[in-house]
From Swiss-Prot:
<dbReference type="InterPro" id="IPR020547">
    <property type="entry name" value="ATP_synth_F1_esu_C"/>
</dbReference>
<dbReference type="InterPro" id="IPR036771">
    <property type="entry name" value="ATPsynth_dsu/esu_N"/>
</dbReference>
<keyword id="KW-0406">Ion transport</keyword>
<dbReference type="Pfam" id="PF00401">
    <property type="entry name" value="ATP-synt_DE"/>
</dbReference>
<keyword id="KW-0066">ATP synthesis</keyword>
<comment type="function">
    <text>Produces ATP from ADP in the presence of a proton gradient across the membrane.</text>
</comment>
<keyword id="KW-0139">CF(1)</keyword>
<comment type="similarity">
    <text>Belongs to the ATPase epsilon chain family.</text>
</comment>
<keyword id="KW-0813">Transport</keyword>
<dbReference type="GO" id="GO:0045259">
    <property type="term" value="C:proton-transporting ATP synthase complex"/>
</dbReference>
<dbReference type="GO" id="GO:0005886">
    <property type="term" value="C:plasma membrane"/>
</dbReference>
<keyword id="KW-1003">Cell membrane</keyword>
<dbReference type="InterPro" id="IPR001469">
    <property type="entry name" value="ATP_synth_F1_dsu/esu"/>
</dbReference>
<keyword id="KW-0375">Hydrogen ion transport</keyword>
<dbReference type="Pfam" id="PF02823">
    <property type="entry name" value="ATP-synt_DE_N"/>
</dbReference>
<protein>
    <recommendedName>
        <fullName>ATP synthase epsilon chain</fullName>
    </recommendedName>
</protein>
<dbReference type="InterPro" id="IPR036794">
    <property type="entry name" value="ATP_F1_dsu/esu_C_sf"/>
</dbReference>
Length: 132
């Protein structure tokens, strides 16, 4: 198909997605990375956030806790630490996780601050993936 590329998302749990996509935006370490068909070869890390991709004009979202992306030969392969499609996110659980992390961060005593910050970032990514 003209104007598309193969997008594949893989996590330790297995294959999450394989689609012919028109566009993908990834959370990179220095900002978002946008990829269109026939993109130049690329290998990069990705951060905690939301992967947004377009298939048949419709934007879909996947929450990720980081990983790597490889782009070559009109194929985009994302090796994600975790990958949860937005429609599968339990929004109530994600909101509760966000609240717990925020509470931990306000107390700051007897906790691993970095761990609480990462938990908050993951919860926010899941919430953002679940919402339109």
């Amino acid at each position: 198909m003209a104007g598309t590329f193969t997008l594949r998302v893989v996590s330790p749990e297995g294959n999450v997605l394989k689609e012919e996509a028109e566009f993908v935006v990834l959370p990179g370490g220095n900002g978002e990375i946008g990829i269109l068909p026939n993109h130049a070869p690329l290998i990069s890390s990705i951060e905690i956030g939301v992967i947004r991709y377009t298939v048949n004009g419709k934007v879909e979202k996947i929450a990720t806790s980081g990983g790597f992306v490889e782009v070559s030969d009109n194929k985009v392969t994302i090796l994600a630490d975790t990958a949860e499609p937005g429609e599968k996110v339990d929004l109530d659980r994600a909101l509760a996780a966000k609240e717990r992390a925020e509470k931990r961060l306000t107390q700051r005593e007897g906790i691993d601050v970095r761990r609480a910050e990462l938990a908050l970032m993951r919860a926010v990514a899941r919430i953002n993936a679940a919402r339109n």
